[in-house]
Amino acid sequence: MLELLKSLVFAVIMVPVVMAIILGLIYGLGEVFNIFSGVGKKDQPGQNH
């Protein structure tokens, strides 16, 4: 019974942690792509996007 409780607590703790890591990675990748697209736009002054 104690092992079951331990695994349950571990799962409850890990789920938000893993979700936070995934969201952080998505946000970080978005920031990186924004930086790269900003650099690309600076290299091409003829476009108005």
From Swiss-Prot:
Any one biological process term the GO annotation gives: response to antibiotic
Gene3D superfamilies, alphabetized: 6.10.250.2480
Record note on disruption phenotype: Becomes sensitive to some antibiotics (chloramphenicol, puromycin and tetracycline) but not to others (erythromycin, rifampicin and fusidic acid).
InterPro entries: AcrZ, MEP_Accessory_AcrZ
Entries under Pfam families matching the protein: AcrZ (PF10766)
Outcome of swapping residue 30 to R: Loss of chloramphenicol resistance, does not bind AcrB (dominant-negative to wild-type). Partially suppressed by AcrB H526Y
Parts of the chain on the Periplasmic side: 1-7
Domain of life: Bacteria
HAMAP family, per the entry: AcrZ (MF_01484)
Protein name as it appears in the record: Multidrug efflux pump accessory protein AcrZ
Species of provenance: Escherichia coli (strain K12)
Phylogenetic lineage: Bacteria, Pseudomonadati, Pseudomonadota, Gammaproteobacteria, Enterobacterales
Gene transcribed to yield this protein: acrZ
